[in-house]
């Protein structure tokens, strides 16, 4: 009799432990550091990173009422396709900065960060790609590190564990973040440089354009008059 009671209690205890596991897992999933981007709308993978910056997957016309409610003034896409297909709202600026995480360099990140900062000066900003995970996730992580001063570790934790998408999407972005020279990026961003390297294509183009605009002296005009 005692053995039977003991076995029954043991079974009940095991059942209770198993029954609590999903609830505990759900609670752990819902526990989110307050400094991480906070969910706004799951259907669009829409999160708020700061009072003036949001991130999402590719929106559509159905998202417009929500974007208007959030007072979004600029939408930045990292896709090669224009947002004009779904966004033509007067007063909302469209910015297109296509890039790929497997071919990203410092000039791509600086261009994106600069666009975000310039747009934030005018009001709330939404940045997005197709799924809102890899391209958007990389820019978000670099914004955290370069602009907001987060550590790489903290930014990568948010990128990979924040619930923005499948982890296999992040490998190229993680590689870039780990190798990025944050001090050089921060200096280039502050100075208005297009890249951290003077040998980057955009830097060479800028140098060629600057030399082309230098006024040339007329050798005859330089001669002393008699």
What residues fall within each predicted segment?
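Bacterial N-terminal signal peptides that target proteins for export
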Residues: 1-10
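Cys-dependent protein tyrosine phosphatase-like superfamily
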Residues: 14-125, 138-226
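Short cysteine clusters
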Residues: 129
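Conserved lysine of the Walker
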Residues: 135
